[in-house]
């Protein structure tokens, strides 16, 4: 069983150090410390365990070290930055594991960009040696890339010419969409196994600069000092966003921000599921579905209303703790429970308590900690969007689908709401946070995506005073079905049985197509185009067949392709 929880004192492959407002994440992969047997992580290659540590470090920088302005990602190995994902590990892994591995690494790199865009940190990739494949994909997720000019070091995306697959962690998309490299040059770069060295890499826009070995560290340090001296990083921001960001930060005492500690989750693994403090996951393995229940906050009389009170609670503050638990539950299901095809999402609690939390978050959204909590909630909800499981929201008496928890319902593929006033009223409610605090990968809110055909209905929903009962929610277009008490149990049972009887492959593709209506962004191109093509290629004989390139990499045998284009 793979565990996604870790902490700096447990890291095997990364060294995280912080000096004032500068953090350094140095990659030093221990080749014998692997997630599975049968391979060694040479040349700073990585497996899922390496990336779990990276994801944890980035998360901790945001919450535990908010004063950090610059993050330098480097390597402690001489003449090598990172050789990317370990090829033998990929070649011998199941298709499902390959898919989830690439999805998680993509989410980690998107989290780096989210930090740059919304929290103002600038990430610098200091390539002290060759960065190939996933190594360059990690670098290109950063804001700036600097390569050592030692006559040997290069950057490359060699997956197509060497392995017969794609750079699966966003490389192709970021080359043309983020670095804005010309298409013809990107084509050459992506089929050139040996890659490009400093001068041409800079000329083509694949790196920002290159420095000789004797001046490399000095030059990196100078650039770091230059960025750290600026009042606040404005990477990837418009002028208006930058001004608003700086103004909000200046409202805090002398600009000083003290972080909070992210403690280990209270988590119990049981034969039939996982129990957290606020989240419960029950696995019905024979029926191939899970019940995911999220508890609302404690009574509003005890809820904090000021940033100081929130910071005092630290990671035990309900919206942060519950979303950390939800995040872990989603990852656990993805990797450890592949045959669970459907997740029934429920909530329990008082709608007014959830709305009280949202009111506090909205009122203090410019405070660094509240901002990070909101951004984290948005990332977890996007992880739910990108999870290859069906989600049905079940709204019963005692549910609290409101505000930030309403997003769980909106992220679900269907919703069922009991319409039986005699048994106890069911209701759902929006808050101001539903209007823009939790964007999807396509940049839209889930309500915007829901009402693409009728924006005026969206305005009416957001302007609605009070909660929606079942009939009102149905009329407003918020709910899929509103069965009465006579049909409730049968309708839920039949819906579960029907969904779990369908092809999981077809459902994954169908859901990915239906969940992201509206515009396309770099993120949706990565997840919906690059990832989809990579997943297809991962099953093709030219990659993984007996004579495929991935299968034969590193062997004395040569790949033989079926040259029919498909």
For each of these PLM feature ranges, what is it?
Residues 132-189, 402-460:
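CoA-thioester-processing core
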Residues 107, 111-118, 376-384:
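Catalytic-core regions built around general acid/base machinery
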Residues 119-131, 388-398:
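A short, small-residue-rich loop immediately preceding and capping a beta-strand
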Residues 1-52, 57-69, 76-83, 96-99, ...:
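C-terminal alpha-helix plus adjacent terminal tail
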Residues 84-96, 100, 104-115, 128-144, ...:
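Hydrophobic, small-residue-rich alpha-helical packing segments that form membrane-like cores
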Residues 123, 145-146, 210, 391, ...:
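Short, well-ordered beta-strand core segments
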